[in-house]
Amino acid sequence: MFKLSKKLQDLPPYLFLEIDKAKRKARAAGRDIIDLGIGDPDQPTPRHIIEALDQAALDPLNHRYALDQGLPALRRAIAVWYQDRFGVGLNPDSEILPLIGSKEGLAHFPLAFLNPGDYSLVPDPGYPPYKGGTILAGGKPYSLPLREENSFLPELKKIPLGVRKKAKIIFVNYPNNPTSATAEKAFYKELIAFARKNKIIIVSDLAYSEISYDGYRPLSILELEGAREVSLEFHSLSKTYNMTGWRLGWASGNAKLIAALAKVKSNIDSGIFSAVQSAGVAALSGPQEYVKSMCNLYRKRRDCLMEGLDLLGWKAHRPKATFYVWIKVPKATNSIKFAGVLLEKANIVVTPGVGFGRCGEGYIRMALTVSKERIREALERLKKI
């Protein structure tokens, strides 16, 4: 009786929902499932952030509509954090926009700039909302292969001239989900020059900048000369402070791009619960030792998993950022089938690489969001299949 729009029909099933369904079904059957699939931190939000929410929630003024552009205190806290972390000065009134998690901002941004037939240049494999947001805006996603032989960086010179002329946005994400690859200044300089020459907006997803190891410190594209003219950067409190369920992030960078996204959002949502924004101020302005301890915890888990994978003969790159390990499928089968084998025979959930795009075929992603004891148990199970 009712027919879905073509845009919705063009959207692939959301990978993580499909994985969650399979996981819940297995657990309902009484199976002991080790979930290495979805990247949802297993540790609690720091106590001082929860207390800030608790206190702010008691204030009746916070029960009303929030300001569309976010609390001034939160925008100022983000500006201070960016200055301290990256040495980047931002105007809190025009160059920062709080979001209901960075995901919604990333997905809504194409609505501001894509017309039918316009392209977004989307990493493949990549975070699904880049492609989904493009399709829902009426644009066309053009896949940029991220290949191991090129360190999982897009080869900008290989993008056809005809595509460049129709492209309005390029999405990049380093440290990368799902590959855990990183990018350095040389790549960002090339990207900025490419964007300026072709009049393309850079959307940089920096959600994993604070999850890093072995002395590595990820960059912000806004550190580089000329970036602010063509770039908008998205960040989130989800991974840094274990706040995935709180839904709080932001966009920062070019003031005109911020204003365009703000206009889209003003027609779609009514802002972020003010108490959550106050908690965000506490997160960014409070003690940061917790972040270091979380990175140390993930590092130990990474080392445990990498050691076990090496013993199994599975090929994986040792990540120096994010809490993901990108692993070559060790048998002659596709990633979905292999993930199914791990679920059925070992009660282990992993994410098939093809769920992030066709160039993710041949890989699976494991997340470091379970205890080291559970990782060891998973490795023991893998030995038996």
Q: Where is each model-derived feature located?
A:
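N-terminal small-domain helix-loop-helix segment of the aminotransferase-like
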Residues: 2-101, 108, 158, 284-286
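Helix C-cap/helix->beta junction micro-motif
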Residues: 26-29, 137, 197-198, 312, ...
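Conserved PLP-anchoring active-site segment centered on the Schiff-base-forming lysine
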Residues: 112-134
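A short helix-loop-beta submotif of the ANL/AMP-binding
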Residues: 135-141
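Active-site phosphate-binding strand-loop segment of PLP-dependent enzymes
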Residues: 146-215
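Conserved core segment of the aminotransferase class I/II
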Residues: 224, 228-299, 303, 307-308, ...
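Conserved glycine-rich beta-strand-loop-beta hairpin in the small C-terminal domain of fold type I
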Residues: 281, 297-306, 316-328, 360
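PLP-dependent enzyme catalytic core of the Aspartate aminotransferase-like
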Residues: 331-332, 341-351, 356-385
